From Swiss-Prot:
It holds the Pfam family Metallophos. Involved in glycogen accumulation. Keywords: Hydrolase, Manganese, Metal-binding, Methylation, Protein phosphatase. The lineage of its organism: Eukaryota, Fungi, Dikarya, Ascomycota, Saccharomycotina. One of its GO terms (molecular function) is protein serine/threonine phosphatase activity. Reversibly methyl esterified on Leu-368 by leucine carboxyl methyltransferase 1 (PPM1) and protein phosphatase methylesterase 1 (PPE1). Carboxyl methylation influences the affinity of the catalytic subunit for the different regulatory subunits, thereby modulating the PP2A holoenzyme's substrate specificity, enzyme activity and cellular localization. Its cofactor is Mn(2+). Belongs to the PPP phosphatase family. PP-2A subfamily. The gene is PPG1. Mn(2+) 2 binds at D78, N110, H161, H247. Binds 2 manganese ions per subunit. Its EC number is 3.1.3.16. The keyword Metal-binding applies. This is Serine/threonine-protein phosphatase PP2A-like PPG1.
Length: 368
């Protein structure tokens, strides 16, 4: 099947045959293996945050931000899980990358992981859509191992899914990471996709710990939280001026930290079809000219919830019943959770960490 024919089908949310998925994944591996852990691109570019299988919202992005290849896009990761159309979402991005390799750039997020996707929807979705076998999931999660970790725009803007790491002081240290594997539980690679900036909630983040670093172990169970001093040091050492990242739900679609040194971009509106948040894409015209294009959910999502599914069925579809569905429901009943969109701890993948922390803190999340 030709790439343009694949695109025509995918834009209509039609599944591709398994044999085609396999062939496309093989071609993309051949392309991605040639890319460095850190890619360099130039403005103008539009930066996209978490999508989480919200396929119709991704189509909305191509409407408001411009179609490919007219617009140059950088996606910051987390393409799958939670939304009902993770397969269609990642497949469209794969084919667009193959068709327009210089106009679509894909970073790896913490959900581009075999372990995570077995618990938070993507694995089950692949089984349901491809006759109960896991081969398509295997093809796609193999692709995840080839996705790049970071991007630098105009030699001055550092882009990553999550955040910084106490194991990384320079860009050169990122370039030598062995990325062609499952995301480990700890270390530099894990930190890049799991860590978060934290501005107001913990002032001790700007004071060094015993090792002389300005990091604290993240409540997510992986990665770290880090303060302004970490950001300033990293930017100074690498001659950068700011950081763009995703990974955290923002009620207004984006959030700015440390007087503009760090910006979070969130691109999944009404996350999980019920959070009510806005989303944004960051249109970067030059290093000093940019615009947050804020948008709301696509009409198809409203129809999906109103006409196709009741709340229980929707919840069944966006979460693996084995993966603490009751806790997810409890989260949504807690009106105080993420009220300002700035704090949203993960539902911890490491069960022992999760059990200890959830017992003392009901403010759990649905795995961003």
């Amino acid at each position: 099947m030709e790439l343009d024919e694949c695109l025509e089908r995918l834009y209509k949310a039609q599944l591709l045959p398994e044999v085609t998925v396999r062939a496309l994944c093989f071609k993309l591996k051949e392309m991605l293996v040639k890319e460095s852990n850190v890619i360099h691109i130039q403005t103008p570019v539009t930066v996209v945050g978490d999508m989480h299988g919200q396929f119709h919202d991704m189509l909305e992005i191509f409407q408001i931000g411009g179609p490919v290849p007219d617009t140059n896009y950088l996606f910051l990761g987390d393409y799958v899980d939670r939304g009902l159309y993770s397969v269609e979402t990642i497949m469209l991005l794969i084919v667009l990358k193959l068709r327009y390799p210089s106009r679509i750039h894909l970073l790896r997020g913490n959900h581009e992981s075999r372990q995570i996707t077995q618990s938070y929807g993507f694995y089950t979705e692949c089984l349901n859509k491809y006759g109960g076998n896991s081969r398509v999931w295997q093809y796609l999660t193999d692709i995840f191992d080839y996705l790049v970790l970071c991007c630098i725009i105009d030699d001055e803007i550092f882009c990553v899914h999550g955040g910084l790491s106490p194991n990384v002081q320079t860009i050169d240290q990122i370039k030598i990471i062995d990325r062609f594997r499952e995301i480990p539980h700890d270390g530099a690679m894990a930190d890049l996709v799991w860590s978060d900036p934290e501005e107001n909630n913990n002032p001790t983040l700007d004071h060094p710990d015993n090792s002389g670093q300005h990091f604290q172990v993240s409540p997510r169970g992986a990665g770290y939280t880090f303060g302004r001093s970490v950001v300033e040091k990293f930017l100074r050492m690498n001659d950068m001026n700011r950081i763009y990242r995703a990974h955290q739900l923002c009620n207004e679609g984006y959030q700015i930290y440390f007087d503009g040194l760090v910006t979070t971009v969130w691109s999944a509106p009404n996350y999980c079809y019920r959070c009510g948040n806005k989303a944004s894409i960051l249109e970067l015209y030059s290093k000093d000219q940019f615009y947050f294009n804020v948008f709301e959910e696509a009409p198809e999502n409203k129809l999906l919830k109103e006409n196709s599914m009741n709340d229980n069925a929707l919840e069944d579809s966006i979460s693996n019943p084995v993966a603490n569905r009751k806790l997810i429901a409890d989260y949504f009943e807690d009106d105080s959770a993420s009220a300002d969109g700035s704090t949203d701890p993960e539902m911890y993948i490491f069960s022992d960490v999760y059990q200890a922390r959830s017992a003392s803190n009901r403010h759990v999340d649905y795995f961003l």
